Amino acid sequence: QEYHDFILYWVHEVKTPVVASKMLINNPDLNDTETIFKQIDEELTTIDKLVMQALYFSRLDTFSKDYFIQEQNLGVVVRESVKRHSKLFIGKKMKLDLQNVDMDVRTDSKWLGFILDQILSNALKYTKSSGEVKIWCDTEASEKKVLHIKDNGRGIKEEDLPRVFEQGFTGNIGRQEKKATGMGLYLAKQMAKKLGHEICIQSESGVGTEVKIYFEQKDDYLLIAKD
């Protein structure tokens, strides 16, 4: 049923940028080629994101055959994700505050990169132009390493917070923002769990959102991975 629901969602979502692209191409009132190309490029970026979500969703059931856990420099994975979103950072004139991310953690760089992509995409999407995204790492008293991704965007209403990781849930943002799909955080949560990581969100409407990813110590991680 979960797979069926995802396919229905995916087909519905991917039609939107396809139709938008066709309208841009066939609009006789648009003579500015540069504008057309720019807007079509944005729609293609949306399609690419949806394709990647479908690809990773299809791999959830065979996760054990498609991951490789090893010591990774978190800074490398973070910077690669930031680079993939460079056009959005530049286009919206966003400030990036990147500090103390060069910690070694046990993870799969490919899957963690996808998780970070979902979080960064949301941070950029729901933060106004000239806003700020802060990314840093620290270590808690429990010796767990924590990656923080914080924005000063619109935030999430308190009543929506308990459901943000549910499949297809968009809450108040979904009613205001047509491009909200409710799949990014769901996939991020599922993948984090399979990697032995914990992901949580703190947010205040009108102030911003902070996402935290907790990385277990080596011995604790091995116990979690076995489960």
What are the language-model segments listed below?
Residues K87-L98:
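Short conserved segments within the C-terminal catalytic ATPase subdomain
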